[in-house]
Amino acid sequence: MVRKRVIVHGRVQGVFFRDTTRRTAGSRDVHGWVRNNPDGSVEAVFEGSEEAVDAMVRFARDGPRGAMVEHVEVRDEEPEGLTAFRVT
């Protein structure tokens, strides 16, 4: 199991980024959370198999239709054993 924290910058709020991330994570058995930040970015934590988490990072780099991703920060973290994916 691996865990990555991503912060996505660009036009990423108001384009269903969080909901699409939640649905995509659910289809890949990835746990964690996603939230809007006050600075206009979207932040997420993904936990799961290396392959599934890498797929989520690739998704974050593209975003849903309507998003304009400019930059993505990715940081490895220690897994915490999360059991669900939530939008906060």
What are these regions (language model features)?
Residues 1-88:
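Intrinsically disordered, low-complexity, mixed-charge
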